[in-house]
From Swiss-Prot:
Its EC number is 1.7.1.7. GO terms for molecular function: GMP reductase activity. NADP(+) binds at residues 203-226. The gene is guaC. This is GMP reductase.
Length: 325
């Protein structure tokens, strides 16, 4: 098995067939809807909130609302659908969450997307939740995760998952590898690659994205959608407290399994950091799209499909030029 991560890979260009990168199409059909980009902000409290979720939906971007304000979920679904927008929520696997799914069915509230959001998703509890959702609200598109193995992908798909999230602890504020000894940190892209060999349904690459080029690499190795935390954090519109350190503006960013999220120091697998303020989210999304259009033009195509077949080289400890002083 080849082991590599994002920084080890360079994609090899093909002959360009477009006159301008603006001709390249970055849209993706994911579940019932089509989106402008194959990216989704991480469903974390310092990355996504209700206001941002609405903005993303209005502008044809995919989002997943976090699950850390449980009481707000039903009003959120109603508000989004009454506004003519899609509802995309997260659930856990505790007993109350199974009751919550039944309540949605009773009230005939059908979110277009439901993400089962668990650190170790290759588990009986997640499989049971997938089956429970598919029994009570079969029309919802179910995303399940997270997993790091082909066996995990196969089991969740066989249980009824419509898409699977791949990544165990590769994120910037995740310390699973350090705390437990397990994870895909340091080989996330290779894990995605081997999982894609088993997948019959879409995969979401979750964690380890440090540059826009990593989005193209994720698609090359099997992702339909790419979940991004730190690159989406610390914008003007982002949740999280703004602080000034040494004359510069920063916003807090913490992991879903951190004590800042949990409110207690128990089973902690995440940390908190301050990310330098990045300005407008609109500008970041625009730049992301332009960079992905350039990637497609280098791949010799006109849409995202062209990225799936490009050749690549593994270059350990690449020489950086232009991106490091």
């Amino acid at each position: 098995m080849k082991i590599f991560d994002y920084e080890d890979i360079q994609l090899i260009p093909n002959k360009c067939i477009v006159e301008s990168r603006s001709e390249c199409d970055t849209t993706i059909q994911f579940g019932p809807k089509k989106f402008k980009l194959p990216v989704v902000p991480a469903n974390m409290q310092t990355v996504m909130n209700e206001k941002l979720a609405k903005w993303f939906a209005e502008n044809d971007y995919f989002y997943i609302m976090h699950r850390f304000d449980e009481e707000a979920r039903i009003p959120f679904i109603k508000h989004m659908q009454n506004s003519g927008l899609f509802a995309s929520i997260s659930v856990g696997v505790k007993k109350a969450e199974f009751d919550f799914i039944e309540k949605l069915a009773q009230e005939k509230l059908i979110p277009e997307y439901i993400t089962i959001d668990i650190a170790h998703g290759h588990s009986d509890s997640v499989i049971n939740m997938i089956k429970h959702i598919k029994t009570h609200i079969p029309d919802s598109f179910v995303i399940a995760g997270n997993v790091g193995t082909p066996e995990g992908v196969r089991e969740l798909e066989n249980a009824g998952a419509d898409a699977t999230k791949v990544g165990i602890g590769p994120g910037r504020v995740c310390i699973t590898k350090i705390k437990t000894g397990f994870g895909t940190g340091g080989w996330q892209l290779a894990a995605l690659n081997i999982c894609s060999k088993a997948a019959r349904k879409p995969l979401i690459a979750d964690g380890g994205i440090r540059t826009h080029g990593d989005i193209a690499k994720s698609i090359r190795f099997g992702a339909s959608m790419v979940m991004i935390g730190s690159l989406f954090a610390a914008h003007e519109e982002s949740p999280g407290e703004t602080v000034e350190l040494d004359g510069k503006q920063y916003k807090e960013y913490f992991g879903s399994a951190s004590e800042f999220q949990k409110g207690e120091h128990k089973n902690v697998e995440g940390k908190k950091m301050f990310v330098e303020h990045k300005g407008s989210l609109t500008d970041t999304l625009k730049e992301m799209q332009q960079d992905l259009q350039s990637s497609i033009s280098y791949a010799g195509g006109k849409d995202l499909k062209s990225l799936r077949t490009v050749d690549y080289v593994i270059v350990r400890n690449s020489i950086f030029n232009g991106d490091r002083d």
